[in-house]
Amino acid sequence: MSHKVSSCEVIVVGGGVIGAACARAAALRGLQVALCEPGPDRAAASPASAGMLAAQIEPADDAMRGLGVRGRDLYETLAPALLETTGLDIGFWRAGIASIAFDDGAADHLRDAVAQQRQAGLRCDWLEAEDLAERFPGAAPNARGALFAPEDGAVDPAALTRALLADGGRLGVSLLPERVLRIVTAEKQARVTGVALADRTVSAEHVVIAAGAWSPGIGGLPRPLPVEPVRGQMAAAPWPSGTPPAILYCDHGYVLSRGSEALMGSTMEHAGFDGRITDAGIAQIVDGATRLLPALATTPPTRTWAGLRPVTPDGRPIVGRDPETQGLWFATGHGRNGILLAALTGDIIGDLLAHGESEVDISPFAPAR
């Protein structure tokens, strides 16, 4: 997959899950694609993610909810497709997610959310405390109840990224393990002509900026990009013996089972590009996880890590064409929803590049909004 390329039709900047999805989708539509990724940053968002597909769980406006549900549902077909073409299992698990209320106010809020989601045609249930205890033994004994979204779930983010990159390579994507210093334009920034690397320029008709929290640092962009890093700390511990696998969520955190581990998260910290772990952050995570699954109190974390999410001021990703520079596209700013929206973002960018339009209304996510 790694090649010395001097020109192509599309250059994707960033090899995390969003960039990998965009590169694969463009190649799938017959375009000649190169993906620039100098190497994984220890604080990158994709490998740090737990991989929840929580389209119906986290607070969202109508535009984000619709995008999330659509993105989640794509994994139903993407997972077997990637398994067939690459032999890689992305760990798609449609287990359902329970969002648990620990007080009456939270319970009332979640009951309202169940009613609203049902009215919108989504599958969503309210579990009384006794129903929750029966469905999720050992979970949240002090709960007042839970919203249960049976079609939500999870994927393994690392496996997903590897599979997207592998399938991209099968489709002809060239991997350039180099850092993009700046985009190159002509006609007073009216048109993209490629990207500048440390030792050369690679020509292209289209450049897709998909470098997550590092996107604003790419030189030559026509205007400041409103994306900032937000640190999310994570921890893992052994999944309690005898406890059925589950994905549990509340206002204080979440816990999900993957293999023999309990993945616990996560903080939301404005710490710049500081990807360090803190005692306070891990304590916060463990406290939230043990509220959801008290058996975790006896098993201290076996590993900890952090990632830097790319977050925008309005919480929506930036997806689509630059309003002024022809051939410049953005797929960044996904915040906590990068894994959830990766496949859909790839399809949107692929359709825009190949056909000039997408069947998805991306006006709420446009760079010019």
Regions found by a protein language model. Give the residues of each.
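Dinucleotide-binding Rossmann-like beta1-alpha1 core, especially the glycine-rich loop
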Residues: 51-135, 288-290
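C-terminal catalytic lobe of FAD-dependent flavoproteins
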Residues: 293-295, 299-369
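N-terminal Rossmann-like FAD-binding beta1-loop-alpha1 element of flavoenzymes
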Residues: 9-34
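Short loop/edge segments at beta-strand edges and connector loops
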Residues: 37, 128-129, 176-179, 303-305
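Helical element adjacent to the flavin cofactor pocket in flavoenzyme catalytic cores
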Residues: 147-205
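Active-site substrate-recognition segment that forms the wall
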Residues: 21-29, 38, 51-53, 57, ...
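Helix-loop-beta segment of a Rossmann-like dinucleotide-binding subdomain
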Residues: 88-101, 113, 120, 124-171, ...
